[in-house]
Amino acid sequence: MERTFVALKPDTVERKLVGRVIQRFEDRGFEIVEMRMLTLTMEMAEEYYGEHKGKEFYERLIKFMTSGRIVAMVIKGERAISTVRKMLGNTCPCDAEPGTIRGDFGLYTPANIIHASDSLESAEREIDLFFGR
């Protein structure tokens, strides 16, 4: 079974959508094996999004991700990384298909509800960052 990292962003928590988003993963047969709610420090956010440093959206993303609580999760299941990414939909909610998490709940970028690892390497790095492995 494959594991992936998922973070529900501050807009998800603020809009009280956490349960509805988690339900989608459980309905699809995925198992939530670890979960914690936290507020990212500036340092943690910068490490988490370090690959984007220098990009035009970086500062806005860091500010947004440190603006409130997030829910960090490890999700396990068959082809978890690719399937979860498909469930999310396009990064920009306005381009996300209805029926995807971002298509149904996202408002704008970076308030697009959710992040999920895009590769096995990213999943391992992000799980280690948030859950200390």
UniProtKB/Swiss-Prot annotation:
Gene3D superfamilies linked = Nucleoside diphosphate kinase-like domain
Report the enzyme's class at the first EC level. transferase
Indicate yes or no for the key word Ubl conjugation: no
Give GO cellular component annotations, separated by semicolons: cytoplasm
Q: Which organism is it from?
A: Methanococcus maripaludis (strain DSM 14266 / JCM 13030 / NBRC 101832 / S2 / LL)
A single Gene Ontology biological process assigned to it is:
GTP biosynthetic process
Keyword Cytoplasm carried by entry: yes
Which reaction(s) does the protein catalyse, per the Swiss-Prot or TrEMBL entry? Answer: a 2'-deoxyribonucleoside 5'-diphosphate + ATP = a 2'-deoxyribonucleoside 5'-triphosphate + ADP; a ribonucleoside 5'-diphosphate + ATP = a ribonucleoside 5'-triphosphate + ADP
Q: What is this protein called?
A: Nucleoside diphosphate kinase
Q: Which PANTHER family match?
A: NUCLEOSIDE DIPHOSPHATE KINASE (PTHR11349)
**Family recorded in the similarity comment:** Belongs to the NDK family.
Protein location? Cytoplasm
> Which portions of this protein are annotated as coiled-coil regions?
none
Cofactor(s) the protein requires to work: Mg(2+)
Keywords for this entry? ATP-binding, Cytoplasm, Kinase, Magnesium, Metal-binding, Nucleotide metabolism, Nucleotide-binding, Phosphoprotein, Transferase
Q: What is its EC number?
A: 2.7.4.6
Top-rank taxon? Archaea
Signal peptide location in the record? none
Could you tell me which PROSITE patterns the record lists for this protein?
NDPK, NDPK_LIKE
The Gene Ontology terms for molecular function here are: ATP binding; metal ion binding; nucleoside diphosphate kinase activity
**Gene that encodes it:** ndk
Q: Which InterPro entries match?
A: NDK-like_dom (IPR034907), NDK-like_dom_sf (IPR036850), Nucleoside_diP_kinase (IPR001564), Nucleoside_diP_kinase_AS (IPR023005)
The residues the record assigns to binding ATP are K9, F57, R85, T91, R102, N112
The lineage is: Archaea, Methanobacteriati, Methanobacteriota, Methanomada group, Methanococci
Positions of the catalytic residues? H115 (pros-phosphohistidine intermediate)
Query: What does it do?
Result: Major role in the synthesis of nucleoside triphosphates other than ATP. The ATP gamma phosphate is transferred to the NDP beta phosphate via a ping-pong mechanism, using a phosphorylated active-site intermediate.
